[in-house]
Amino acid sequence: MNISSTIKSIQDIMRKDDGVDGDAQRIGQLTWMLFLKVFEQREEEWEDDNSKYKSPIPEKFRWRNWAKYLEDADGKKKPQIQGSELIPFINNELFPALKEIDASDSPTKKVIKQVFEDSNNYMKNGSLMLAVIEKLEEAINFHDFKTRAHLGDVYEQLLNDLRGAGNAG
């Protein structure tokens, strides 16, 4: 599945969630999720290049420690957190921590804080949120040059969707 169809599929999942109302909210939801996913993959590269690299995101809130699917003993991909626990974790722990991150000593922390300052988690259904995360896990790999090259396609699609959102955005 290409990135554009993955984004469309994710938006279709979000349409089923009672908390997400309109394209503007779907785009906002997808933006912060993509940010954390892509940032995590960049951090993996930085860790490979520098063994002393320290993430500006508290360990508990890094994508790899709550969203990334892990293989069980049978080789099946499983979420680290159950749907019923996911929304409370995001709303009560992840968002407050990233909105209040001390950005005084790091430009990277400042970017993280700015991304989350005005962001919201609109999704209310943890199972649907897990379905979105699973799609991101399956399709978005920015270590792959082809995927990186298609990032512009994602951006263009999101802009077109936002334009189509009209006054809702």
Segments from the language model and where they lie:
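Non-catalytic, mostly N-terminal accessory regions of nucleic-acid modification and defense proteins
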Residues: M1-G169
